[in-house]
Amino acid sequence: MDYFPMIFALLFVAFQGAPEAAVLGTELSAGAEDGGEKPAPATPWRPRRSKRCSCSSLMDKECVYFCHLDIIWVNTPEHVVPYGLGSPSRSKRSLKDFFPTKATVHRKRCQCASQTDKKCWNFCQAGKELRDQDSMEKAWNNQKRGKDCSKLGEKCLHQQLVAGRKTRRLEAISNSIKTSFRVAKLKAQLYRDKKVIYNRAH
């Protein structure tokens, strides 16, 4: 019998992994010469998310949408939610973040990563001004609601009447929605019960 083709095939398969084996052999021999110490494995590289700025509140969805550049935003019927690209590696925080001082009570909407980014700077500043304006308007509206409109005039009476109608209409709509949900739930339960009875009968 001629074993030459079979031996040749086995040698070919065995020597295909020869370069890797040679490299591994040199590493092992070098490790044995150094006293058997293995080099520490390098920490895996994790991609950092590119952030244009950091928001002072994560509840501010507009700010989060503006600042986080690589988040895919998914529209759901309820709200817009971020569809993240893995957990980002976070930088260490200073003690100032844990113990806020009195000066940091009136913070900006966000803090830009680059000081030369004018669009970001304008966005953060405009957000602060808008929030201040909204809070002033809310305070004025609350003050008007609390006061008697006889002193403020006809416009105040009209606004109170419109606001009252709106709230009553919204309450009626929410009540009808709740009722329709309850009815649908009862119908679904009745259908399930009928289906179970029908299956048991046959």
Swiss-Prot record:
GO MF term (any one): endothelin B receptor binding
Domain of life: Eukaryota
Keyword Signal annotated: yes
Region described as Endothelin-like: spans on this chain: 110-124
Site feature location: Cleavage: W73, V74
Signal peptide: 1-25
Keyword Nucleotide-binding belongs to the record: no
Keywords: Cleavage on pair of basic residues, Disulfide bond, Secreted, Signal, Vasoactive, Vasoconstrictor
Protein family (similarity comment): Belongs to the endothelin/sarafotoxin family.
Name of the protein in question: Endothelin-1
Organism whose genome encodes this protein: Bos taurus (Bovine)
Gene from which the chain derives: EDN1
